[in-house]
From Swiss-Prot:
Biological source species: Prochlorococcus marinus (strain MIT 9303)
Quaternary structure (record): Protochlorophyllide reductase is composed of three subunits; ChlL, ChlN and ChlB. Forms a heterotetramer of two ChlB and two ChlN subunits.
InterPro entries in alphabetical order: ChlB/BchB/BchZ, LI-POR_suB-like_C, Nase/OxRdtase_comp1, P-CP_red_C, Protochl_reductB, Protochlorophyllide_Rdtase
Name by which UniProt lists this protein: Light-independent protochlorophyllide reductase subunit B
UniProt keyword terms in alphabetical order: 4Fe-4S, ATP-binding, Chlorophyll biosynthesis, Iron, Iron-sulfur, Metal-binding, Nucleotide-binding, Oxidoreductase, Photosynthesis
UniProt GO BP: light-independent chlorophyll biosynthetic process; photosynthesis, dark reaction
Gene: chlB
CC cofactor note: Binds 1 [4Fe-4S] cluster per heterodimer. The cluster is bound at the heterodimer interface by residues from both subunits.
Highest taxon, organism lineage: Bacteria
Comp. bias regions, Low complexity: 448-469
The protein's role, per its UniProt record: Component of the dark-operative protochlorophyllide reductase (DPOR) that uses Mg-ATP and reduced ferredoxin to reduce ring D of protochlorophyllide (Pchlide) to form chlorophyllide a (Chlide). This reaction is light-independent. The NB-protein (ChlN-ChlB) is the catalytic component of the complex.
Assigned protein family: Belongs to the ChlB/BchB/BchZ family.
Catalytic residues, chain numbering: D292 (proton donor)
Length: 536
């Protein structure tokens, strides 16, 4: 067991809660102690929903362990069914309740409820949230469709079926959930995009789907796997049992959206889409070819998040914006293989870890100019003084905007372009201010044109301001006890001319060179010599 202050994923029963909360007419009875009810806050505070998740907790206490906890489970099952009258009932247990081994799913199956009852067994000590969501969605679809044998679905999934029936092709969008990254907006964007290409959306699941909608899944011509972490297992099962093909391209970015449309048109035997549609619909291709984008070319970027968004971000950064990807990783071990493959194409070794300290150390070692990650990478990047944009869950409430802000499709590419480029542009402004801070116009004590109304800092305020803007002088005092070389005012002035997002790396390299060369004081010449040494 490992103690930590941060985790990228919750236990698997939180993933089951995401599926139940995303759907309509589904209720989840969770065998759990009172302390495990914290997950409600994820939906009301982070997702900002106006209602609590449809979950009933058994909330057993220590004194209940001396009695029959199975009867406690049965009582809560009856109460939940009588009160909520769900169309389908999910039954599971939290990580703590798993130790009691009451098997609430088996208990519920034998109580004779007149609705589908799906028992969810999630290994809490070996799997995590995304796997729990995937397994819950898979078991729910399988449990509901098991009442409808595949030969009775009455649908042929040959590409020519929709043509012979004289209708438009229809697809299922599988994978979006609550607490996913911009899932609701992604669905709206894809529904609009597919409609423009003559393709109807048949069922969206699990988000806002009902159990009856899951019964209609086989009536579509193919499935679109939007989020492999959640929907790939279900898509594979539908392919095996109903012969339903599914798309494997996630349409995040201009190039991926183009490939996604080509894949759908090919699977459905439709005419090929317009290859120039991306340039017409999205501003990202135009900007990446403009003169202004030269500032972005070759920028070093570090990427970490869930597998789907990390892989998509790496492709956009490398192929569409001209960035240099210096780090790529994920916390999702289920997506380790495709992330490793994507990293190998970029000449990198993927970072597969759920230890935020290891991620921060890798980030500092890579010395990027932009970080694309989760909420935790935003905190780590702030400590390192690096611009950051959030591209993946886990996220904070500020990453759940009330406005329309998709990640998929042509409009999603525009949103991504804004989210990634703006931190770099603001970083450029900060660097320019730092470069010209000591010029005549920026001197703090310079008299205002308003005469006596102009501000005048006291000597103490000036010292505090200098300490805040130039923390390196204070760090020299602290590090002198470690026999580090001392920075002269000339050396500090030269260091201040270097962009802030690589200044830390330059400082470390210069001090390392000074130790090797036996220099006790670092001046401007030492900075130049270190630069030549490490470039050689």
């Amino acid at each position: 067991m490992e103690l930590t202050l941060w985790t990228y994923e919750g236990p698997p029963h939180v993933g089951a809660m995401r599926i139940a909360s995303s759907m309509e007419g589904v209720h989840y009875v969770l065998h759990a102690p009172q302390g495990d009810t914290y997950a409600d806050l994820l939906f009301t505070m982070i997702e900002r929903r106006g209602r609590r998740p449809p979950v009933t907790y058994t909330t057993f206490q220590a004194r209940d362990l001396g009695g029959d906890t199975a009867e406690l489970v049965k009582g809560h099952l009856r109460e939940a069914v009588e009160r909520f009258n769900p169309e389908a009932l999910l039954v599971g247990e939290s990580c703590t309740a798993e130790l009691i081994q009451d098997q609430p799913g088996s208990l519920a199956s034998g109580m004779g409820f007149n609705m589908p009852v799906v028992g969810i067994e999630l290994p809490a000590y070996s799997k995590k949230e995304n796997w729990g969501a995937s397994e819950t969605f898979y078991q729910l679809v399988r449990g509901i469709l098991s009442k409808q044998p595949s030969e009775e679905s009455g649908v042929s999934h040959s590409p020519a079926a929709w043509k012979s029936e004289g209708r438009r092709p229809r697809v299922n969008l599988l994978g979006p959930t609550l607490l996913g990254f911009r899932c609701r907006d992604d669905i709206l964007e894809l529904e609009k995009l597919l409609n423009q290409h003559g393709i109807d959306v048949h069922v969206v699941a699990p988000l806002e789907a009902r159990p009856a909608d899951l019964m209609r899944l086989p009536n579509a011509d193919l499935n679109v796997c939007l989020y492999p972490e959640i929907a790939e297992a279900t898509c594979l099962w539908l392919e095996r049992n109903y012969g339903m093909p599914f798309s494997k391209t996630v349409p995040i970015g201009v190039g991926a959206t183009k490939d996604f449309l080509e894949e759908l048109h090919q699977l459905l035997e439709m005419p090929a889409p317009n290859p120039g549609e991306g340039a017409e619909q999205s501003k990202l291709p135009w900007y990446s070819q403009s003169v202004d984008s030269n500032y972005l070319t070759g920028k070093r970027v570090f990427i970490f998040g869930d597998g789907t968004h990390a892989i998509a971000a790496a492709r956009i950064a490398d192929q569409e914006l001209g960035f240099k990807v210096v780090g790529l990783g994920t916390y999702s071990r289920e997506m380790a293989r495709p992330v490793r493959a994507a990293a190998k194409e970029l000449g990198l070794e993927a970072l597969i870890s759920d230890d935020y300290l290891a991620v921060e150390a890798a980030m500092a070692e890579a010395a990027p100019e932009l970080v694309l990650g989760t909420q935790m990478e935003r905190h780590s990047a702030k400590r390192l003084g690096i611009p950051c944009a959030v591209i993946s869950t886990p996220m904070h409430v500020q990453d759940v905007p009330a406005r329309y802000s998709p990640q998929m499709g042509w409009e999603g590419a525009n949103v991504i372009f804004d989210s990634w480029v703006h931190p770099l542009m603001m970083g450029l402004e900060e660097h320019l201010i730092g470069m010209f801070r000591h010029d005549f116009e920026f001197v703090d004590g310079h008299q205002s044109h308003l005469g006596h109304l102009g501000g005048h800092q006291s000597q103490t305020e000036q010292q505090q301001s200098q300490a805040a803007t130039n923390p390196s002088t204070q760090s020299n005092t602290d590090s002198s006890s470690e026999e580090s070389p001392l920075w002269t005012p000339e050396g500090e002035a030269e260091l201040a001319k270097i962009p802030f997002f690589v200044r830390g790396k330059v400082r470390r390299n210069t001090e390392k060179y000074a130790r090797q060369a036996g220099c006790r004081r670092i001046d401007s010449e030492t900075v130049y010599d270190a630069k030549v040494h490490f470039r050689a």
